[in-house]
Amino acid sequence: MKSAIFITARTKSTRLPKKVLLEIKGKTIIEHLIERLKMAKLPDLIVLCTSTNPNDDVLVEIAKKNGIECFRGNEDDVLDRFEKAADFFNLDFIVVTWGDEPFCDPEYIDKMIDFYKETNADYINCEGLPAGTFTYGLKVDALKRACEIKAETDTEIWGGYFTESGMFDVRTLKVEDEIIKNSNITLTIDYPEDFELVKEIFNRLYKGKVFPLKEIIKLLKENPELQEINKNCQELYEANIKRLTKVKFKKPTKVK
């Protein structure tokens, strides 16, 4: 079984332009993410999945500089990009991350791969981690089926193809560690205030190497004023996700 981490990233962004290239402590957001993802032990490789748009050439250079693979595909059809990348690298299972989430937890990437080995699930979500730290797992065979049934070419938000069709074995990896279990914290970067919070976390915790998620949670619990920085963004984030999660299928689907 061959697995990989896919980093979904483009420089195109409406709410916070070129956010993956914003710098903290001398590194871009996406480079901090790559550094963290390298801590995962089970994936066979890390692939930066970006678009063929010339504006994303800079991301190709970042991948080369940081010693990871890169694949370029359709700018808007993310599922198509995933499928072609999975074929190119001959993968069986992928763990999906986003380039604007520098705190993605490598421990739960390994847990997700182990969970897949136990269940052979088509689609795995992670329940309990803060927004911006969890991932999704996809069996490549299921990804190919999803690409066959989708009726849209813009699949930036794609989870519904797996969860709403009734065609896939959907499983949930639940977080049992009470220290990091916290779904009320938002650590993704969608708005300027999000970036200010992330920057403050790095300023306090980053000493030249990756710091664990537990330290981030501890910092935020001990300093509740930090969560006030992007408090208003959480509702915007949730509303935007709900707006984008509707998906269209080519034909009616049936539960197996």
Predicted features and spans:
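N-terminal nucleotide-binding beta1-loop-alpha1 segment
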Residues: 1-16
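Short, well-formed alpha-helical segments that are part of the catalytic scaffolds
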Residues: 16-39
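Conserved N-terminal catalytic core of the sugar/cofactor nucleotidyltransferase
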Residues: 31-92
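Conserved donor-nucleotide/metal-binding helix-loop-beta segment in metal-dependent transferases, i.e.
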Residues: 84, 105-129
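Short beta-strand-to-loop acidic/aromatic patch adjacent to the donor-nucleotide binding site
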Residues: 91-101
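Short beta-strand-to-loop element that shapes/binds the nucleotide-sugar donor at the catalytic cleft/hinge
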Residues: 123-141
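Anionic-ligand binding region
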Residues: 133, 141-166, 172
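Conserved alpha/beta core of the MobA/IspD/sugar-nucleotide pyrophosphorylase nucleotidyltransferase superfamily
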Residues: 161-256
